[in-house]
């Protein structure tokens, strides 16, 4: 019952919800520059000092060193490869009790040093969401 009480019912039925809340992805750098380095990255949540998120795509066959100024959690959405020393892959099916290689936490020290992401696929990109907590120094609120 508590959860039902905290829902904003008016916002959930707002016919103009998208117009009021949609955030167009914002590239972190020039797409031409990052694509030449084998990756693309965009801010997808960037209006709150309390949390933010980016979508990172590492192109097929590319190896990219990705640097951030803050720790983050990562969820893999597509592809397989390596992230630092770890194998990463997107599971097609998860059964109860099975471990997966699609969620990781990156410490601030590792993020600042840079995380090497290797995509061995000839056809599929690696796509991941990176979510940050409060006070991300890379975030420019707009």
Where do the language-model regions lie?
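C-terminal amphipathic alpha-helical segment
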Residues: 1-71
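Phenylalanine-focused residue identity feature
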Residues: 17, 22, 43, 51, ...
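Well-ordered beta-strand positions in beta-sheet-rich domains
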Residues: 55, 93, 114-116
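Ligand-binding loop in jelly-roll beta-barrel domains
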Residues: 86, 97-138
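Glycine- and acidic-residue-biased ligand/ion/polar-headgroup-sensing regions
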Residues: 50-51, 58-101
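Double-stranded beta-helix
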Residues: 1-20, 119-142
């Amino acid at each position: 019952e508590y959860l039902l009480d905290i829902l904003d019912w008016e916002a959930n039925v707002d016919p103009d919800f998208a117009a009021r809340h949609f955030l167009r992805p914002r590239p972190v750098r020039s797409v031409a520059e990052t694509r030449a380095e084998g990756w693309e990255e965009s801010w997808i949540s960037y209006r709150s000092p309390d949390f933010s998120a980016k979508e990172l795509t590492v192109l097929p066959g590319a190896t990219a060193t990705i640097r951030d100024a803050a720790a983050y959690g990562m969820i893999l959405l597509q592809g397989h490869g390596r992230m630092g020393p770890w194998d990463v892959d997107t599971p097609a099916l998860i059964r109860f009790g099975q471990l997966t290689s699609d969620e990781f936490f990156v410490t601030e020290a590792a993020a600042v040093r840079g995380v090497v992401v290797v995509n061995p696929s000839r056809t599929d990109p690696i796509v991941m969401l990176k979510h940050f907590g409060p006070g991300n120094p890379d975030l420019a609120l707009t």
